[in-house]
Regions:
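Conserved N-proximal alpha/beta basic substrate-recognition cap immediately N-terminal to
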Residues: 28-42, 50-156
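ATP-dependent carboxylate/phosphate-activation module, predominantly the ATP-grasp catalytic core
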Residues: 215-272, 307-332
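C-terminal structural cap/anchor segments
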Residues: 282-341
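Phosphate-binding site of ATP-dependent enzymes
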Residues: 159, 185-239, 292-303
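ATP-grasp fold ATP-binding core
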Residues: 155-176, 197-207, 288, 305
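Peripheral (often C-terminal) accessory segments that flank ATP-dependent C-N-forming ligase machineries
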Residues: 325-373
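Glycine-rich phosphate-binding loop of ATP-grasp-fold ATP-dependent ligases
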Residues: 141-142, 160-185, 210-212, 234-254
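A long amphipathic alpha-helix within ATP-dependent nucleotide-binding catalytic cores
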Residues: 236-298, 337, 342-354
Length: 373
């Protein structure tokens, strides 16, 4: 069995749209084109990747130096399993246009269930189940609201809050709201309610660290893959990751939390809770975003987001596992390109030991740079 990968970063926006015919904003199109080569790095040997117009010289060099065993997709072959960044009617349409038969693609009913599970309500349900399971108090769980009055009540209770659209991509649809400034934002929030039916509201935290637990769902079971420590700009716009072993990331997280006991308990309980909430309706990579915070009587916010899709955390976890020298560490950044496709590194046995490499090919509008210090 081989996988057919598709980088489709606009999938969260496509889920909000809810239809197969979706036109993403220009920035999302540029990001997709630039990142089309990412699965070449995280796919398994024998997998194929949908990426058009790949620079042949660049591809030969990264294959030779890093031992990539992935291939550029030409046409569908029996046994290929579609593996998009995320599932939606829009991502399924891309596979259909590439000749992938309907028999190996999810049905509209299955995709509607994935869309429902991708609603931020799922994070609320997982958070509530986790709060019931652990023998200690957790940060308040996000609330789903359907009126502006409910937003106002949450702001009165918590002070500053964050309002989130049910479906939105990194950094989009995340709106900070102050209790005394709600009227100014009322019109835009009412518009969001009309479009998506509800909003999620949670306290605005004094954040110390963003991190995530990485899983794979398969046949109703949830398996732990590793950890991710990442950086964001503003309210949630992703900028990069730490490249390090799971053990090193775990130590960094526990330092930010001031201990390991609660984090260990959350990691113990989460797989069973995720399996119970999601069941067999979704198979593939999954990430649970968390935060270390200061004040308010707790340090861990264990369920900020539940992402039923590939994440940059998974990309970095797999890149570190397969392409970074043992015991080394570094960073991964995503930025608008000022010279993409750079390969300025020392490698040994297919692994980078010093320097940096761009996972995007030359001429891309964005760079996805992994660097070992």
């Amino acid at each position: 069995m081989s996988r057919l990968h598709l980088f489709f970063p606009e999938n969260d926006l496509a889920l909000a749209h809810g239809k197969a015919s979706y036109t993403p904003p220009p920035a999302a199109v540029r990001l997709r084109r630039a990142g089309a080569t990412l699965p070449l790095w995280y796919g398994s040997p024998g997998d194929s990747v949908i990426c058009d117009g790949v620079n042949a010289a660049w591809f030969r060099e990264v294959c030779d130096r890093f031992g990539l065993g992935t291939k550029i997709f030409v046409d569908y072959q029996d046994g290929m399993v579609p593996a998009p960044w995320g599932w939606s009617l829009a991502s399924r349409k891309v596979f259909e246009m590439r000749g992938v038969p309907a028999s190996v693609l999810p049905t509209e009913g299955q995709l509607e269930r994935v869309r429902t599970l991708s609603h931020r309500r799922t994070a609320m349900l997982v958070g509530e189940a986790l709060a019931d399971a652990v023998p200690f108090s957790l940060a308040p769980v996000a609330r789903e609201v359907k009126t502006i009055d409910e937003v106002s009540q949450a702001a009165d209770k918590y002070g500053d809050v964050v309002v989130k659209l049910p479906w939105s991509s990194s950094g989009r649809g995340v709106i900070p709201v102050k209790a005394d400034d709600l009227d100014r934002q009322r019109q835009s929030l009412e518009g969001a309610l009309r479009r998506q039916g509800s909003l999620m509201v949670e306290p605005l935290y004094d954040k110390l660290l963003d991190f995530a637990a990485l899983y794979t769902m398969a046949d109703g079971l949830c398996n732990f893959d590793g950890l991710s420590v990442f950086e964001t700009a503003g309210f949630g716009s992703y900028t990069g990751n730490i490249l390090a072993s799971t053990e090193e990331l775990y130590a960094k997280i526990c330092t930010a939390l001031g201990g390991r006991k609660q984090f260990d308990a959350v990691l113990d309980y989460l797989p069973d809770i995720l399996a119970r909430v999601i069941g067999k309706d979704y198979s593939g990579p999954l990430g649970v975003d968390m935060m270390a915070v200061r004040g308010k009587g707790y340090s861990l916010v264990p369920v900020v987001e539940v992402n039923l899709r590939m994440t940059m955390g998974h990309v970095c976890h797999r890149f570190y596992r397969d392409h970074v020298g043992s015991g080394l560490s570094g960073g991964f950044t995503v930025s608008q390109s000022h010279g993409s496709g750079i390969i300025d590194c020392e490698t040994r046995g297919g692994r980078i030991i010093k320097g940096r490499v761009d996972m995007a090919q030359p001429g891309s509008d964005f760079s996805f740079v992994a660097e070992v210090y």
